[in-house]
Structures are given as structure tokens and as C-alpha cells.
Regions:
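Alpha-helical cap/lid subdomain in secreted, periplasmic
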Residues: 1-119
Length: 120
């Protein structure tokens, strides 16, 4: 995130905002949904487990990224579906193949979450 320039395309916020605007210009009558990434962990080169919920790797934690995604969606009229806290959480390790990538059960939970949004 670049506080001085919210259109900075080298940031997640700036790139996401630009992408949303491009879709809105090209397809003005569609409703856009953004699905967040699910919770996950990974192991660094030293064998340390990185918890993306609390460990800042230099550009913020995953929660920072989620907040930037939510803000970009809010400012641009895009529906945001939270899978990070809403579908796959730190308790759902059986939904991940390697601590981060979804397995079949994880994909089904994401699909269920997506389906619930459309039923509302």
C-alpha cells in the first residue's frame, strides 16, 4: 500500500483498483465479486513455519493485504467474499495440502461459501 499514491500499480491496492476500474469500464453492467485468499501457512528456507496472519515478511501481514482488498472493493462498489476468516481458518488444516494450497475439501468449503453469498 502506498499512502502517498493509491494508484501505484506496484502495490496490491493500486493494481486491484486499476483492474476493477478496467472491468467496470469494459463491462459496466456486470456485478464483480472478489474472493479473498484462504488462510494458510508455509515453511521458509530455514524450516521455520510462517504464519501469514501475524508474520510480516516486509510488506505487511496477510491481514494487511485483506484490509487493502476490502478497501479497494468498498471504494469501487465490488462485492467482497471473505474466505480468510469465513471459509478456511487456522483450524481448517485438513482443507490444505501443504499448509496453503486447497485440497478437495478446501475447494468444496470455498464453493459453499460462494454459494451462500448468492442465496442471500
Amino acid at each position: 500500500y502506498d499512502e502517498a499514491n493509491d494508484k501505484n500499480l506496484t502495490t496490491v491496492y493500486g493494481a486491484l483498483t486499476a483492474t476493477i476500474k478496467l472491468f467496470q469500464e469494459q463491462c459496466p453492467h456486470i456485478r464483480i465479486y472478489l474472493l479473498s485468499q484462504p488462510y494458510g501457512t508455509f515453511t521458509d528456507a530455514n524450516g521455520k513455519t510462517i504464519d501469514i496472519d501475524r508474520d510480516d515478511l516486509g510488506n505487511g501481514t496477510m491481514v494487511d493485504y485483506l484490509n487493502w482488498e476490502v478497501e479497494a472493493c468498498r471504494k469501487n462498489g465490488v462485492s467482497f467474499i471473505d474466505n480468510y476468516y469465513g471459509a478456511i481458518t487456522m483450524e481448517d488444516t485438513d482443507c490444505l495440502t501443504d499448509g496453503y494450497h486447497l485440497n478437495q475439501k478446501g475447494r468444496e468449503k470455498i464453493a459453499e461459501r460462494f454459494g451462500k453469498v448468492f442465496k442471500q
